A protein has these predicted regions:
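A short, basic-hydrophobic beta/loop patch
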Residues: 104-119, 125-157
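Short, charged/polar connector segments at secondary-structure boundaries
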Residues: 1-115, 121, 132, 174-189, ...
Length: 271
């Protein structure tokens, strides 16, 4: 009963966040619900699919749903919009109970990835609960939709990501400057074609999560640069090992010391 009461309280907080996001989007003239991949893509925009199997999907890169369905149940930030006493609310609270208990939310979601962003086919409520609790990842069966190649910077960077993904198996590494992956490998002391071990991947992901949190607290998400771009700039000055050695305040100050270089990525030529 304690978990049940706790989950209802959490739902009310999530509902409040959802309604706030919905209201702000409406006031700003933005679409107030989840993005729908089927409404973004047309046949001439895609160049095939790749089944990636089961991977750890970064929660912050899940931005919408595959098809319209019940998108009006969620605000654009995946927070709920329906009352707590609805069937939707009851199911959300059950998932919350599982997350807070020993069981956890273990069933993988199913989703599609396009240009580094994920769209859920099955498991929206699981994503909602874990986004509310600010989880880092969720297991998911992923189908990658390849964009038609065009000589734009965004598509060039994405195809570079696709090329290096088998080496890193990390979706956190999305850059806005072509040529960034070889520079990252070099900064970490690896050869360009080095395949990361599971330990290297786990260690990097843990440190990067810490770096990304500090970057976001500085409102880095408002910049044109991604957190991966910011890391690459930071690595010009500091060794990667320092991320876990610094205190939170030291890490923040170190990012601030290269902030102008990070900001310049939005308008500068590739570095």
């Amino acid at each position: 009963m304690e978990h049940q009461s706790e989950s209802i309280n959490h739902y009310q907080q999530a509902l409040k966040a959802g309604r706030k996001a919905h209201r702000q989007n409406v006031q700003q003239g933005n679409y107030p619900f989840l993005q729908v991949l089927d409404e973004i893509l047309t046949d001439n925009m895609t160049a095939g699919e790749v089944h990636l199997g089961l991977i750890e999907v970064p929660i912050d890169k899940i931005v919408g749903t595959k098809s319209r369905g019940r998108t009006n149940a969620f605000a654009s930030n995946f927070m709920p919009l329906l009352p707590a006493d609805s069937e939707f609310g009851h199911k959300w609270c059950q998932l919350c109970d599982a997350h807070l208990g020993d069981e956890g939310i273990r069933d993988p979601i199913s989703c599609y990835e396009y240009l580094g962003r994920f769209y859920v086919q099955e498991g929206n409520k699981r994503v909602s609960v874990l986004k509310y609790f600010e989880a880092a990842t969720i297991p998911g069966y992923v189908i990658r939709i390849l964009p038609v190649y065009t000589p734009t910077t965004e598509i060039q960077c994405y195809y570079e990501f696709v090329h290096y993904y088998p080496l890193t198996k990390l979706y956190q590494l999305l850059f806005t400057q072509p040529g960034s992956f070889p520079k990252l490998q070099a900064a970490l002391g690896y050869e360009t074609d080095h395949v990361w071990t599971n330990d290297e991947r786990r260690h990097f992901a843990s440190a990067f999560y810490r770096f990304e949190n500090a970057f976001r607290k500085l409102e880095g998400e408002t910049l044109a640069a991604t957190s991966a771009d910011a890391l690459l700039v930071w690595l010009r000055v500091f060794p990667f090992s320092r991320i876990c050695e610094m205190s939170a305040s030291e890490l923040t100050r170190s990012i601030q010391s290269v902030w102008q270089d990070i900001k310049s990525l939005g308008s500068a030529d590739p570095i």
